[in-house]
Amino acid sequence: MATMAATKVPEVRDVTRIERIGAHSHIRGLGLDDALEPRQVSQGMVGQLASRRAAGVILEMIKEGKIAGRAVLIAGQPGTGKTAIAMGMAQALGSDTPFTAIAGSEIFSLEMSKTEALTQAFRRSIGVRIKEETEIIEGEVVEVQIDRPATGTGAKVGKLTLKTTEMETIYDLGTKMIESLTKEKVQAGDVITIDKATGKITKLGRAFTRARDYDAMGSQTKFVQCPDGELQKRKEVVHTVSLHEIDVINSRTQGFLALFSGDTGEIKSEVREQINAKVAEWREEGKAEIIPGVLFIDEVHMLDIECFSFLNRALESDMAPVLIMATNRGITRIRGTNYQSPHGIPIDLLDRLLIISTSPYNEKETKQILKIRCEEEDVDMSEDAYTVLTRIGLETSLRYSMQLITAASLVCRKRKGTEVQVDDIKRVYSLFLDESRSTQYMKEYQDAFMFNEMKTDTMDTS
């Protein structure tokens, strides 16, 4: 009796994408032209022309390195784009300038003091660009000869022939270099570089002259020109690290492991002083340069009087980044005191700040922001639905209307629709309450909730 082999069907799993859509993932920059004039709609930014122009001036001063140790406060009502302006500045600065964003409540921890958390945030925002020159050998591999001992034991020896367009040289190889060449699968026709100090081999690709060696090649195969000039060259390598990373590595044995685990703990001031002295020495010798970055503290009114006192002192340091703060508070109590102050910030710190104010969005700007968010979230919406959603945003809040986009899209897909209509918006609006309707509901049914007002005369104290 013939038996049939069962065919195993491979299981296919959906992998959730890591790239999530955040509240400010549509921001690409500040949307300014070369003359620092803001465009009405550009790079995900809408409206707030005066605030964006002011942020652009600050941005230029940061890029020129002329404003280190300064502080800027972005103040405005909730939902007026304060964090968006800060994120736009971070995008415009690029990856070379360190940008650290924290919330005011993040510094309160049981593991470390408030001043230590602020110091680490300051040090993360200051970069050090270290330059070093290395000698490399760069050329096209002509031939690799490896002589193995006849007995099978003993050290391997060999010869490596490299060439450029102007010269050709034979190098003697030791055991470790042979192992490196074997590991990298180097063969004739490859263009490689060898770091003379470390012996590290890097494959740059295959030479164009060897393009016809094989009929079929993988997509990862890259063809490059044969190097010209001398085989041995001096190359300048630039490393950019933050002062905090140097602190952590030098704070303990195998401190570099703490960079990955995040368990940095408190770092002694003596370690930081030694690092500051060494960095100053490198700067005088021309080996390194300081890059003043940006520290952004959102919800700055959550800091207490001790933190504000520390910020006053830290901003006077010669190694201080640009400090950008954001708050949505008016005249309120300074945390840790009984005194009131504008934005909940002490007057002596307010004197040091350049204050940028933001204003509420009008109907046209609100509609444009909602359209940008729909594009970011891949949601198709009819013009009437945009109008209804804009009206909801003006009557309630911009954040609430933005949160309805994804919910309305899901309702639309459930009814097999391709475009979000007014009925979808109305349905999610009735399902999810905004702040004002929720407050009204609480007022109507407050007696039905627990712990509303406990009446002492009904309690049995016997």
UniProtKB/Swiss-Prot annotation:
Its EC number is 3.6.4.12. One of its GO terms (biological process) is chromatin remodeling. It catalyses: ATP + H2O = ADP + phosphate + H(+). Signal peptide: none annotated. One of its GO terms (molecular function) is DNA helicase activity. It comes from the Eukaryota. ATP binds at residues 76-83. Keywords: ATP-binding, Cytoplasm, DNA damage, DNA recombination, DNA repair, Helicase, Hydrolase, Nucleotide-binding, Nucleus, Transcription, Transcription regulation. Forms homohexameric rings. Can form a dodecamer with ruvbl2 made of two stacked hexameric rings. Is a component of the RNA polymerase II holoenzyme complex. Component of the chromatin-remodeling Ino80 complex. Component of some MLL1/MLL complex. This is RuvB-like 2. It comes from Xenopus laevis.
